[in-house]
């Protein structure tokens, strides 16, 4: 009996000790969470930079969006050996889950919008200390501009997209927008107009550094494009008047050499409202790996290799032949071909059309050096996307 009492007492004491223990809550400092993040101005800026980082994805401005916007326009065409891509630009949709024409752009535009929403959900938190109120307002305006930028292209590509202004959560339910694409586009554009008008009030007129961040002119330019999509011509005109005749006149003007707008060496010039900054030090920019992201590709681009002439790259999208013919319909006052054609396109007859430019090289070679077939000699490649002129 005594032995039983001793054993029972031992278990009772152990149970009491275990029951009174406090749970030790250890945070993993090597992994970020919402509980640890969004506490400082640096956190907000890091979140903002994550939105900018979405420029450098295949589905956005590193590669595929050019195929979509140019290839599906009247002046673009694809003769790519990749059948799905070729047919996509001709509105032949045999695979709605085609990664290059649909999935990557949809996914990565939404990722950018969700990241912007995260910044906007936290930036008004009074517990976060900023260098100044102007700093906070500028950062908020940047987030609104970025969200509007991505939404603009979402609507112009898909028309019928849901308007999501908060960070996504697991409890979110799909939006039912079937049968009302035009009305939904108006809803989205109206919200973007409101956001950009607010951003205009708080973005700086110009930036002495950080040229990759938007200014008032960037916001006015994007707002004008949205107004035009919305067929609000008078409001669009007001935006352009601010740029050309108003306060923006001190920043923006026409280039003395208009061809500078077609040259990668004269970027961010006086005609530029906003430019995405790419690095030629890592110009391939192949971000889609088995692990999804390649940290070494975050400032590069696949623009040139995607649209370069046959034999140099993938030539996934190029110009329609009628562009050349249309340019040549009207001569300059001295009887020459329109010089804009020379800076826009590269084609077999360019040397004859522009004898004032006898050594027309692209990536170190003349057209004849590529020894194209008779059929390929009728093709027209987009010269302005190269980094060789």
Regions found by a protein language model. Name each.
Residues 22-84, 161, 197-198, 213-368:
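An aromatic- and glycine-enriched ligand-binding surface/loop that stacks and positions planar moieties
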Residues 18-20:
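C-terminal motif of bacterial Sec signal peptides marking the signal peptidase cleavage site
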Residues 160-182:
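Short coil/linker segments at helix-helix boundaries
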């Amino acid at each position: 009996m005594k032995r039983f009492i001793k054993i029972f007492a031992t278990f009772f004491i152990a149970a009491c000790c275990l029951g009174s223990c406090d749970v030790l809550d250890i945070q993993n400092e090597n992994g970020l969470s919402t509980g640890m993040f969004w506490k400082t101005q640096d956190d907000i800026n890091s979140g903002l930079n994550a939105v900018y980082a979405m420029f450098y994805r295949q589905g956005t401005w590193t590669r595929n969006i050019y195929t979509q916007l140019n290839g599906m326009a009247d002046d673009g065409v694809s003769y790519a050996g990749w059948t799905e891509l070729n047919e996509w630009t001709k509105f032949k949709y045999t695979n709605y889950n085609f990664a290059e024409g649909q999935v990557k752009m949809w996914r990565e535009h939404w990722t950018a919008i969700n990241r912007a929403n995260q910044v906007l959900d936290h930036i008004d938190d009074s517990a976060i200390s900023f260098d100044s109120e102007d700093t906070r307002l500028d950062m908020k305006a940047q987030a609104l501009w970025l969200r509007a930028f991505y939404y603009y292209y979402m609507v112009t590509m898909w028309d019928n997209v849901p308007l999501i202004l908060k960070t996504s959560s697991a409890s979110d339910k799909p939006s039912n927008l079937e049968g009302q694409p035009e009305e939904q586009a108006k809803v989205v554009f109206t919200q973007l107009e409101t956001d950009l008008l607010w951003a205009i009030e708080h973005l700086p007129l110009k930036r002495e550094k950080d040229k990759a961040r938007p200014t008032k002119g960037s916001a006015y330019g994007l707002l004008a494009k949205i107004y035009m999509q919305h067929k609000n011509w008078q409001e669009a005109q007001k935006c352009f008047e601010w740029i050309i005749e108003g306060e923006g006149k001190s920043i923006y003007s026409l280039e003395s050499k208009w061809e500078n707008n077609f040259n990668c060496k004269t970027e961010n010039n006086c005609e530029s409202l906003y430019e995405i900054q790419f690095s030629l030090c890592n110009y391939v920019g192949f971000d889609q790996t088995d692990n999804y992201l390649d940290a070494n590709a975050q400032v590069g681009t696949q623009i040139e290799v995607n649209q370069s002439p046959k034999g140099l790259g993938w030539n996934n999208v190029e110009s329609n032949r009628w562009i050349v013919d249309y340019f040549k319909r009207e001569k300059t006052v001295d009887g020459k071909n329109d010089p804009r054609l020379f800076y826009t396109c590269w084609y077999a007859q360019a040397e004859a059309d522009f004898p004032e430019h006898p050594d027309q090289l692209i990536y170190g070679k003349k057209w004849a050096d590529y020894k194209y077939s008779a059929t390929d000699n009728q093709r027209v490649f987009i010269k302005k996307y190269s980094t060789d002129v």
